[in-house]
Amino acid sequence: MSGFEFHPTTRVIFGESCIDQVGAIAKELGSTRTLLVTDPGIVKAGYCERVKNSLHKQALEVLEYAEVVENPTDLQVQKAAEFARSNSPIDLIIGLGGGSPMDVAKGTNFLLTNGGRMEDYRGFNKATKPM
């Protein structure tokens, strides 16, 4: 299968070795200090190190939160947000892995930009600040 790029409202890049582009993309977005949200399996597989290397090649600082568990709860998101706050400022969040790291990364973004708890955002149009 050949690689491709798809640009709806969210940019999706697919293809062999595209993980190595993460640093250049983060720099293009203006990041200087990135939070990488992932799980122990992704770390063990070596993907986290590849992303960190790509970010470091662009002289970007990386903070790693690799404690995501399968089917994360609101408490997991709260812990990730607390980690992010204790290491602020952060100007980019990357969710690396499957659905669980992605969900925790998105939830962390909600809490960092809008405050409160995850339960505050059940429903529609609850987040009032841009993320």
What label would you give each PLM region?
Residues L75-M131:
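Glycine/threonine-rich beta-strand-loop-alpha-helix active-site module
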